[in-house]
Each structure stands twice: as structure tokens, then as C-alpha cells.
Design a protein with these regions (language model features):
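Internal hydrophobic scaffold segments of catalytic domains
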Residues: 37, 41-48, 52, 63, ...
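Alpha-helix capping and helix-coil boundary motifs
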Residues: 78, 211, 330-333
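Conserved AdoMet/S-adenosylmethionine-binding subsite of the radical SAM
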Residues: 80-268
Length: 387
């Protein structure tokens, strides 16, 4: 595989210029001032918001605390405004080799309030960008909606169906579609030729975890090909809400914690990985790895995970076999990436199989480290800074 920053950057500039000439002054202003034009990508990719907020009132969810509301509002950008916002983002790059995109982080993308905007955004992402796209949903999709997915020719689509409980779904997710409808969606997606995954997140210890094997078996029977085993990030409100309905998890969290806390769940995750393999589901510890596998399934391309999970403790040795993919990188591309993204001229560059050693004079701040992570994603190699 060849990883070229200059090719991605040139494609980005050409598309950006085209849309700037096409859109009105007001549309350009909205796009360039929007958060999609400014945010750093997360490990799963750059999150795309087709709505803000959620009214499903899932007991374990932190979204109501982010926005201070339990209702949904469709996102304000048009499809082409979203594309310009992304192309205006210093840390976004187009094409299948570029930035992963993820729907479903702060809303339900296929809720009736959000679905039209979601499909609009998907259409224009496919038309202009062609990036890998992942969505997570609890909502059932009709046949005509699934058929819209078939029209996309450039993006690689990775469908994640969120399902953590059948027995307790009615109290954990009171306003969400029933688990049976989600299993039906998995069947419908497989029938239409797609390769859906079950998104097992959050992983709630004790009572919910006890039925995990049954949930995974039902998802496998419905046609899921793999499972993303997530973590669980809690707040005081979430802990109290769970306690009210009989789910006590205090043993897993420190006393008097403030803000958000991610539970330590390694033994639970390891157990689910083992169970998944036994029943024929491919397990993943992160959504980006499932997206990477979808690229192989959809496009026949073996591209290493954008988040470099194969160099961390997140790799589960899926069929992509990222660690054994040779990535060719040119020194001029590395120099250009540091100049364009960080405004830094490296003193020396040493490109090795899995690492790029960079010598710079400046001490790098926390933000600079995040920018280095962006460059790592382009080249699929760890960057080691030497001073």
C-alpha cells in the first residue's frame, strides 16, 4: 500500500475550491464556522452529527448531560455545507485512504427526526469524498432505506447495530426499538448484501453481562459477522439511574469520582472475545478495527487500521492482518505533512517499516501530540519524535 499525504491534500484542496465556488457566501460562512470544520477526529474517526441530542432516554447514556436536553434537533448544515465543513477541517482528508467517519456518537442517526439528514449527508459523502463510513443504530430500517445504501459507489459502509440486552432492554432503553427489531435489521442487511456487526456497548457488568452470550448467539443467528465490544463510561447520574432500576455497579468505580469515569472491564472483554470466537463472530475491541475490516469486505483493499490498533493492545488479529501490511511512504510526503498540519520543518526523517523517526528542535505541546496522531493515521505508522 502507498500512503501519500500529497495526493490526499491535493484532492482535498480541489474539492474545497469546487464547493467554495458553488456555495453562497452564507452557506460558506455556516460551513466554515461549524464544529465539523474544527474538531479533531476521535479514535473511531471524525464524528458526523445529523442531529443533536436524543430522546430515547437510555439509562446508561451520557448524551443528555452533554446537551442538557432529552429531545432531538436535526443538524443545521445542508449536505454540501457539511462537505465543505469537513474539507475546511485541517485534520480531515478525503477518499477511502482518508479519515474514518462515524455516525451515531451523540444522537440516533436513523431516528425519524434525524434519518433524512443522515441520508442526505451519506449521499454527499459518497458523491464528493468516498471516505470509510460507520454508523451505529438501534432503529429498524425499511427496505427502501436499505436500498439507498446500495446506491453508494465510493464509500465503504460499516453498519453497527447496538444490542446489549434482550432481557432488560425495556428498562435500560425504554424508548428504543425492541431487540427483536434490531435483530430483524441485521437479517435485512445481510439479505441485502451488507455485512453488519453487533455493537455491544456499553458493557454493563453483572446482570446485563450474564446474558451476553445469549445476545451474541442471537445476533450471530440473525446474520451478524462480528462484534465490537465496547467499554462503559459513567457519570454520577448514570450510576444513580442504574441503581434505581436495580443495577448496582459501585464495586467497579472509585468513591466520590467527579465528571466521567471509564470502568475497568478487561476480564469481561476478554471473556466476550473468547465467547465470540467460539460462536463464529469476529471480535473487535474498537469500532475503527471493524471499519477497517469493512473496507476489506466492501472494496477488497487491505488497509491498516487508521488508529494503529495493531501497534497497541486493541488488535484482535482480524482477517485484515494489519501488522503484516507493508506501507510505502515517501520522505517528501512526510515533510509536507508536518509542514501543512503542524507548520514544522523536520530536521531529519527516518522511515522504517512500522515507525517514522522525526527529529525536531521544538518541544511539542499536547495539541501538537494530537496533530502527530493525525499524521500517523495518514501514513499508518507510529511517529517517534527525537529532540
Amino acid at each position: 500500500m502507498d500512503a501519500s499525504f500529497n495526493k490526499l491534500y491535493s484532492k482535498k484542496i480541489i474539492l474545497k475550491d469546487f464547493l467554495e465556488n458553488r456555495l453562497s457566501i452564507e452557506s460558506k460562512r455556516r460551513a466554515m464556522n461549524d464544529s465539523h470544520a474544527k474538531r479533531f477526529p476521535r479514535p473511531c474517526g471524525l464524528t458526523i452529527h445529523s442531529a443533536v441530542g436524543c430522546n430515547l432516554n437510555c439509562v446508561y447514556c451520557y448524551v443528555p448531560e452533554i446537551f442538557g436536553m432529552n429531545y432531538m434537533v436535526p443538524y443545521g448544515l445542508s449536505g454540501e455545507e457539511l462537505i465543505l465543513a469537513l474539507l475546511s477541517n485541517k485534520y480531515f482528508f478525503p477518499t477511502i485512504y482518508g479519515t474514518y467517519l462515524a455516525f451515531g456518537s451523540i444522537t440516533e442517526p436513523f431516528h425519524p427526526i434525524a434519518s433524512l439528514k443522515t441520508f442526505e449527508y451519506l449521499y454527499f459523502i459518497d458523491k464528493y469524498l468516498g471516505n470509510p463510513v460507520q454508523f451505529s443504530t438501534k432503529f429498524f430500517l425499511r427496505e427502501d432505506q436499505i436500498n439507498l445504501f446500495k446506491k453508494y459507489r465510493n464509500i465503504s459502509l460499516s453498519p453497527l447495530i447496538t444490542l446489549i440486552s434482550i432481557k432488560y432492554a425495556s428498562i435500560l432503553e425504554p424508548n428504543a426499538p425492541k431487540p427483536e427489531k434490531r435483530l430483524e435489521l441485521i437479517r435485512s442487511l445481510r439479505k441485502a448484501g451488507f455485512k453488519p456487526f453487533i455493537f455491544y456497548r456499553p458493557l454493563i457488568p453483572y446482570k446485563v453481562f450474564e446474558e451476553a452470550e445469549n445476545v451474541l448467539r442471537e445476533a450471530k443467528r440473525a446474520g451478524a459477522i462480528g462484534v465490537i465490544i465496547g467499554g462503559f463510561r459513567v457519570t454520577e447520574r448514570i450510576v444513580m439511574n442504574l441503581k434505581k432500576i436495580g443495577f448496582t455497579i459501585e464495586a467497579n468505580i472509585p468513591k466520590n469520582f467527579k465528571g466521567q469515569y471509564s470502568l475497568h472491564l478487561r476480564k469481561y472483554k476478554d471473556s466476550l472475545i473468547k465467547i465470540s470466537r467460539e460462536i463464529g463472530l469476529i471480535p473487535f475491541k474498537s469500532a475503527c478495527c471493524a471499519n477497517t475490516y469493512s473496507i476489506l469486505l466492501n472494496k477488497g483493499l487491505r488497509i491498516p487500521c487508521s488508529n494503529l490498533c495493531f501497534q497497541k493492545n486493541f488488535c484482535t488479529n482480524c482477517p485484515v492482518d494489519c501488522k503484516n501490511i507493508s506501507v510505502n511512504v515517501e520522505m517528501d510526503d512526510v515533510r509536507s505533512a508536518f509542514k501543512k498540519i503542524m507548520n514544522i520543518e523536520p530536521d531529519s526523517i527516518d522511515i522504517q517499516r512500522n515507525i517514522i523517526n522525526i527529529s525536531v528542535k521544538k518541544k511539542l505541546s499536547g495539541k501538537r501530540r494530537r496533530e502527530i496522531a493525525i499524521i500517523e493515521r495518514i501514513f499508518r505508522k507510529k511517529i517517534n519524535i527525537i529532540r
